[in-house]
Amino acid sequence: MILGWLDRQDRFEISIPFTVDNATWHITKQNDYLPYKAVLWRPENMGAPLKDITGWVYTNRIHFYQLWKDVKGKRVFTSTANPDIQVQAFLDDKHLYVALNNLDESPQQVSLDVASLGVNIQNISVKSLTVFQEDFPRYYEDTVPSIPSEFYIEAAETIVLAYNLKTPMAFKNQVNAKRYYSTGFLVPIEAHNEMTFEFKNVKSGHGFASLSMSIGRNHDVSKRPNVLINGTKVAVPFNWKGYDQANRKKFFGTIEIPVPIALIKENNTVSIRFPDSGGHLSSLILNVETSKKPIQ
């Protein structure tokens, strides 16, 4: 979830993982003298009364802190063609941190474009944490001279790459991100009925744009409506972040729809029409990321 929080860093004061200390209050006869599930430390001799505990050891929750403990710096612009791969990057003097997370239930191929680093790479520190449903998490770290241009990231795996550079890198451009919220929300979806949303006073330029369409619908109806922005049709992707939610009674999620930045005007009209009835469009957000110079 941390990569999702980092996407909203400008809207958070603080975010803290739900991890407690050793929670000695839970080690009682009623609980079979077993530790609380969300603890960072557990007894080395589990199942013993509190007075008989001989020492404390880390639980697997320590891996979260091992994975992220060195990451810091100023945010670097990143993008991904695969919505199931979350990515964040931060630059701190001679260290570039790139974090990747796989939301899909199967391994995903990753191809990193870091050509701008050139021969400035001294080495790369690799950290990986994979969480399994029926087994202990797997954590490892290593330092390598290089990594393949293409590699796979496992389901539920998070990778943090630290590119250790020979000389510091400087920013040559700045990206400004702005979210514009529609005034209409929780709109009932009716077959072939056009839902219209207005976005005014939008600042455009070089960069990228997208629509965040949040919907709640039954599984047997469409998730891909006809979408027009200022009269021009834009493609709705077949894939979105995460899984299909087939184990739930209904689908409820946000589908990101890429929009060519050239279509964005100061005042914009978005029209959405589904081929079938049922459910609601809960909200629609226009995301615009612009820069003074074109993003390479």
Predicted segments — roles?
Residues 1-63:
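Aromatic/acidic polysaccharide-binding cleft in carbohydrate-active enzymes
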